[in-house]
């Protein structure tokens, strides 16, 4: 359908938040939508909630599949989508009522392939951390896209995509981290023009049980592979590739800082992360110098990672002694 928006919601054991999410979608001022709920094998009451809403509103289409992961759920949603535009909303998040209307209007007026907005962070205790919105629209040719800048966007939620630009792109089902970041990178690579709308229309819940939080495990290691692929996506876009490699080095430094005390973050993993960090460190330095910054902290971590890990371990011992 010409201007229909297909809203894809991957679902897995989110009964606590699902009503709020679906209600916010159905309350959209822009009514030409279909809501594709893909239940990825939930064991809680998510299935019952989805069926109840589907009975109330014929714009909802509910699909159930055995547990295969969020990437498979999103891929199923894309396959089932009938709209000309696609938006992804996580089942534990919710959107403001003008989310679809405002993004679609900008995308059409500016002839964009992708438009994304700001988010409001909703903490686990219910506290809402708002951003000051200018409601200004920024647009640029996709080849000028950069990571590591204030207006960047690296995930699929909070964005509206022209379907013809992304329908043949698949979420990587072998990744458990940054699979949406890789997908967004591939969408940018396919796009002609993208835009950023400085308005907080998407409410993102920060939950302790989120896959990007907690202790290190082998699934989190797939973040390294995701960023390898992202850098490869932009192989022939010099500026974007440079900024992606700079971000990759930062990601490696972050993993060392956050997980070096975890048992699963063993020597093999540490050495691989350090290898990737050192490989991309020149890009981090070059990119920051281009922007008038000197990344001293990242340089120290990247050049002397084993000393930094030793420091973190000693610091942990001191803190335990002091308790």
How does the language model describe each region?
Residues 86:
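Short aromatic/hydrophobic "clamp" motif used to bind/position activated sugar donors
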Residues 13-27:
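Short, well-formed alpha-helical segments that are part of the catalytic scaffolds
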Residues 24, 31, 39-48, 90:
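A conserved acidic beta->alpha catalytic loop
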Residues 70, 91-195, 202-219:
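Donor-binding/catalytic cores of nucleotide-activated saccharide
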Residues 200-207, 213-242, 254-284:
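Catalytic core of nucleotide-sugar-dependent glycosyltransferases
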Residues 3-6, 24, 34, 182:
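Cell-envelope/extracellular polymer assembly enzymes that use nucleotide-activated donors
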Residues 261-323:
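Membrane-interface aromatic/basic loop that binds lipid-linked glycans or pyrophosphate carriers
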Residues 65-81:
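Glycine-rich, basic loop-to-helix element that forms the pyrophosphate-binding segment
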């Amino acid at each position: 359908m010409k201007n229909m928006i297909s809203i894809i919601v991957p679902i897995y054991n989110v009964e606590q938040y699902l009503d709020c999410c679906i209600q916010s979608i159905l309350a959209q001022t822009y009514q030409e939508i279909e809501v594709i709920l893909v239940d990825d094998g939930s064991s809680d009451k998510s299935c019952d909630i989805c069926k109840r809403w589907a009975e109330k509103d014929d714009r909802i289409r509910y699909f159930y599949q055995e547990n295969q992961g969020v990437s498979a759920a999103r891929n199923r949603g894309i396959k089932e989508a009938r709209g000309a535009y696609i938006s992804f909303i996580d089942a534990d998040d919710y959107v403001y009522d003008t989310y679809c209307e405002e993004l679609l209007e900008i995308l059409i007026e500016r002839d964009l392939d992708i438009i994304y907005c700001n988010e409001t962070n909703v903490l686990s205790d219910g506290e809402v951390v708002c951003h000051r919105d200018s409601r200004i629209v920024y647009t640029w040719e996709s080849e000028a896209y950069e990571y590591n800048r204030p207006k960047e966007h690296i995930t699929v939620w909070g964005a509206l995509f022209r379907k013809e630009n992304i329908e043949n792109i698949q979420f990587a089902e072998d990744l458990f981290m940054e699979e949406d970041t890789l997908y967004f990178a591939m969408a940018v690579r396919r796009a002609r023009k993208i835009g950023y709308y400085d308005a907080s229309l998407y409410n993102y819940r920060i939950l302790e049980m989120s896959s990007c939080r907690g202790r290190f495990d082998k699934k989190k290691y797939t973040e390294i592979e995701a960023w390898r692929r992202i850098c490869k996506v932009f192989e022939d876009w010099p500026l974007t590739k440079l900024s992606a490699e700079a971000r990759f080095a930062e990601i490696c430094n972050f993993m060392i800082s956050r997980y070096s005390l975890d048992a699963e973050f063993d020597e093999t993993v540490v050495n691989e992360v350090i290898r990737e960090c050192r490989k991309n460190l020149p890009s981090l330095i070059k990119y920051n110098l281009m922007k008038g910054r000197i990344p001293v902290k990242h340089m120290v971590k990247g050049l002397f990672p084993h000393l930094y890990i030793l420091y973190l371990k000693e610091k942990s011992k001191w803190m335990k002694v002091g308790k």
